[in-house]
Structure formats: structure tokens, C-alpha cells
């Protein structure tokens, strides 16, 4: 019997020990989570949290207003002003509890039905890539009077409702995205904090175990780091809302507490920022009392304390600042088998560099964790967990940044954000939810080797996949692969097969001011050249001839009308009287002579017939008609011989007789992807601008005919038309594109191209609301000129000089970055693409030859060749494209690999 009693006693003790080890010692800690909330209620769509100590809270989900890596110092100060205003709005008896939550996730994209091959490859390439997402919640809590009995105070309740809506409106008016959590969302938010799980779709609860160092739940452990040790508040005397990091010898502002969003090994981080708003009158009295106490015992340390208090009192009196109590802590969650010391070292070192020494005595882990529940902040110990400061200083320690998210837009162009995950932006700046631009024309500048053609391949590929008609003018075979992939039309200029069109062939409805203007520019370009100067008389003369040419074709010339004869008669009489030649004739004889001149002019015009519309017929008409017009209007100084000589090159029998006389392939208007390759004539001072102008007119016609989105991309060929002669036409085209859902883009690599040309500035840049800049390091010494021409701000320049310079390469393939400004909104994005896209865009000859070998050997489509080639490339284990292409070319066959290449 005694043995049974002993065994029972041992079992009882063992059970008690296990219970204490697992669930704590009982008492208050045992029921600590049950004692937080009384209920969650719905009040007009707002979920209100009621605690058992009598406080009630509303939770707003917000998005921090400062874009990460925005480089804008003012935006950090705007944040401090905003939250100081929120504190002023709430006033005594309220607390602001801001929780910034950082969650380590893996990128996942749901494949769309019938997704294009390259887009599917793009998202498959990024699937599983780790990144940090962020969430932000702001809890507004009204303090309850501490007593054993709680009574309902309708006045306080109404005050609470009024103030939470004021806060919501103040945030919204400042451009912050904000919404109240409803009852279900508020309950879920609390559950997720309890489980420290903001990643999974469903949340499961588990037992919590706490010790002096950590709080554990299930398969994760958490440690709470208090930012300030109240017994030894180690903070700098002066604090700003941002700090600077050095990137490429340029200072880049980042959040003062940006270290909390990249803690190593952390799966979840919750940064708790709590501001309590006490009675100002009481706190000032206590401060004054403290000052007097220090002053009563004169010694150096007390004297310093008195001076510090006086300084604070002066600031409060002069600037109406608030005294607030604050608490800051970080709840860092890691997998259960992870050592937290690495997190601790990172935080101590990072904050130490800023002069902030985080508390080393956080033995009350469970209490800190529980007090950080939404709405439960008033359970923080007033003596040990709160410190007094000014509201501005407190707000400086808040987290202010947000990560880049995809924009709401029907046209999605994917880049990577600066941590390497895809985000969609509205490249036009005018089709998304937020309108950023008035037109979608763009200007792209990047030195040779900066990746601008690769970037443009990516942009036009995505535009075309989303229903955009693309026309490109290229001078270096940069888009041959993409054109072949899409099965588009690739037109190369050769002497045997020149790019031709008959710009004079139009119908009566097309005859308008802009068509006349285009033809006038075309004729003047041939006559004068790109750098030639045109007088107003010459300009008017060519316009006059073109008008009469079409009048002769559409209407014919049967003779002058009575009014035309009268006008011509008056003109000839005036000219005759002003003539220096003296004639001895009567008025009647003069009238007869002038009538004879009119009959002669009329006869010559009747003889001028236009049977068909072409350059040939225009040439024939103009060389006969121009002398008559000059004679009729007493025009002098027109060099008709030069006109005939220059125009004749494009006339029947001339070197370029086909260029302006043969009709262009009409199927081009139905093609959705067209590339004009004109590298062979880029050094021809006449053909180069002329053919470029022809292509632009083709795009204009396509722009009017097609109802979908259109884009024209002109690579280096734009230089051919950047002349005073073409300036007005370029302006016209840019402005017209906006009216027909079209964009015109210019891509260049030479800095001198934009510095030395007023035409570029006036006609192109001023009409391009979208600016794209690749790595500008080569131009850094001369960048002030570019800055002035492009209208870049100092903030823009700071961003530009971080291109390809951030420490964000780890775990990523080779990529380039590009600065994009849409209107006044700008950012830096990554151009990172999978092997399939790379092989579609590549201009490297060896790589193109290797891909052609696969296509030829497999006798398959371009897409199938890319699939097979990239499969072997991935299996080979060779990281870079060129070495693998060389292996393929050496083998001279399809590799069909099953294992990694070892040598």
C-alpha cells in the first residue's frame, strides 16, 4: 500500500512539473491571453476592440506614405508633420499604436489562361523567390479610468467616434491609403498577431510558452526587443526622421529605423510604435518640479539636466509641441531551430551606429508581447516601459516606408522592384487608376552597353502581348529575334529592295492640312536637305504647288472663275504700274494686254493634267507650274535649277526612282509587329531622313486606321529628322499621337545628341511625359546639362545615381536597372528576365547563331527552338549565355543534355 502511495505522489509531482514547464506557474500568466479582450463589436462597419480593462480601440489599415528608396527627404518630414497632427487631433487620453509588420514570403504567381509563352516563362522564373512584404496597421485607443467598476460614458464614446473619423480623413487628405478594419478583419488581425502568422491564408492557434528570453508558439520562437531601456535611455540628443546611406558616392536618405525590415533569419517582424497622449498641464508641472529639484543641488550633472529641461520647455512654449510617453519594441519571429543571437547582433550593431542602444534587459518577454496586442497598449508598465519625449522625436522613431506594389492598371508592364520581385507599372502613366501623365510619349537615354535595347525589347514584348500594335525603326538588328518570335514583318532596306511608298497617293477625304504639311516637309527635305534653311516664300510656294496639284487631279482645271480672273487682273495691273519698264499705251491697250496674259496663264494651266498620283506626276507638274506661279506673283530668288536637280533623283530613271513611286505593301497596316531595319542607309544624308519620314507617315496612317493601342519606337534613326526643317512635323506627330491612343518613343545613346540639339528639347523632350534613363555613370561629370534639359529634380538625380549600385544582387541573375519618370512620379526598376526572354532579345552573334542551329536542326518554330535551347542551357549548369552558345556552336548540333556539363 505504501508503495502505491509513493508511486502516486511521484506521478503527481511529475505532472505538476510538466504543467509548470509547459504552461507556466499559473496565476495571472496562466490566463494572460484570456484577460485581454472583452469583445469585438461592429459599429457602422468599424470593428471596435473592447478590452477587459475598459479601453476601446479602432484599427485602420494604412500604407506608409514614403516610398522606399524614394530619395525624398521632404517626404520623411511630411510624415512627422502628419503624425504630429494626428496626435494633436486626438489629444489627452488617447494612444496611437502603429504596427509595421514585415513578412518573409516566396513570390508566387497564378498562371493565367492562355498566357503567352514568354510571360509564362517570366513568372515561372521568379516563382519561389524570397522577398519581404510589409503591412501597416494603426490602432487608436481611448484610455479608461482605472477603477474596479466600469461605467458607460456616452460623451467619451461620441468623442472617440468623432476622433477616429477625423484621423481617417486627415490620413486620406494627406494621400495615405487608409481603411477601417471591420469586425471580422479586426478579429483576424488579433489572431494573426497572437499566432505571429501574417503569411498563410488560414491561421491555427497553438500553445504559448514564455521564458526570460523568448516567447514560443508552435514551430516558431519570438524575442521582443525593447528599443529604449528606461533606466538608461541611450538616445542621441538630436534625431531626424531619416538617415543617409552612401551609394555610388551619393547620399541616399532611408528611414531612420530601416534596419527593422531586413533582420537576418527573421520570418516575421512586428515593429510596435506606441505614443501615449497625457495631460500636458500635468506633465509640464512635473517637468518644472523636476527642473527645480535638479537646480536645488548645484553640480555639473544637475546643471546639464536643468539646461536640457529648459530647452524642452522653450520648444514647447515656442512651437506648441506635445509631450508624449512612448514605447517602441520589435517582436522578431524565427523558426524554432534558429539561433536568435544573429538577430540580436544585427539590431545592436545597426542601432548602435545611429547612437541608439537597445535594451539588454527584456526579461518581461511575455508581458511585452501581450501589451503589444492591438488595443492593449495601456497595460504597459508606466514606470519601466514608457519614456517621456516630444511628439516630433517620437514620430522620428516610427517606420515610414512602404515597399513597391503593383499598380492598378489595365496595361501592365512588369519590372522588378529593388529587392528583385516582379511589380507591374503603367508605363504610359495615363491608363492606370492614378493618372500621372498627359501623354504617353517617351524618351530613353542610355550609353552603349547599358542595356537599353534589352530594356526596350522587354517593354515592347509586353505591350504587344497586351494588344498593342508595334512599329519600330532600328539601325542595329536589335529587334530581329523578337520580331521573328512574334511572326512579325521585318523589313530591311537594300538597294535591290528599298523601303518604298507612294505618299502622294491619297483619296479626296485624306486631303487635309496635316497631309499637305507632311508632303511639303517631304519635298523640302529632298530639295534642301536636313540642315538646309527654308525661306517663308519657299515654304509657301511648295504648299501652293501641292494644293494646285491635288486640285488638278480631283477637280481638273477648266479655266479661271470670274472672281479668279478679277483677282488676277487686279494683281497684274498693280504689278504693271509698279514696273520700271515704261510703256506708251492707252488704258484700253493695257487692259487688252493684261487679258492676253491671263489667257496665256489659263492656257498653260489647262495643259497641265494629272492622270495619276505619284512622285513622278508631282515632279512633272511642279517643274512646269513653279515658274508660272513665280511669274504670276512676281516672285524672285527661287533656285529652280537646284530644285529640278535634287528632285530628279527620285524621278523616273533616277537612282531612287522606286522610293516614292511604288506603293507600300498594304498588308503592313494589318501587321501588329513591324520592324524597319535601315542600318544600311544610316550614313546617307538624304535617304536616311527621307525613309525615316516615310515610316513615320506609315505609322500616322496606321494610327488613324487601327482602333487599338499603337506605339512607334525610333532608335538612333531619330537623329535623321532632328533638324529645324522637321521640327514642326515632329511636334505635330507627337501631339497627334495622344489623340489616337498612340505613343511615340525615341531611344538614343549619345549624350551629345541631347545636349547639342534644340530640336530634341523643343520637339521631342517637351512632348514626352515619360523619361527612361539607364546607367548614367559615364555621364556623371556632365550630368548637370542633362538634368537641366530633362527637367530632373535633385531627388530624381539621387535615384539615378543608385542605378545598378545598390547591394541587391544576392540570389539574383544578372540584371540592369532603369530610372523611369512618369510626369512627376519617378522610380528605379530592375530589368531581369529568364533565359527564354534573353534568347529572344539577344543581339550577340554567337548566341543568335546557336539558336538558329537549334531551329534548323529541329525544324521547328522559333518558340520551340527557344524552349529546347533553354532546357539544355539550364541543364548544362553554365551560368552565362555566351559560353553556352560557344559550346553549342563548337558541337554544331543540338546537345539534348540530360546531365550537367562538367568540362
PLM regions and their residue ranges:
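Extended, folded cores of ATP/NTP-driven motor/assembly subunits in large transport
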Residues: 2-400
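P-loop NTPase motor domains
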Residues: 76-89, 261, 356-357, 367-423, ...
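The conserved Walker
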Residues: 448
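Conserved lysine of the Walker
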Residues: 452
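Post-Walker A helix-loop "phosphate-sensing" segment adjacent to the P-loop in P-loop NTPases
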Residues: 461-471, 486
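Conserved ATP-driven motor cores of ASCE-family P-loop NTPases powering translocation/secretion/packaging/pilus
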Residues: 496-534, 725, 729-827
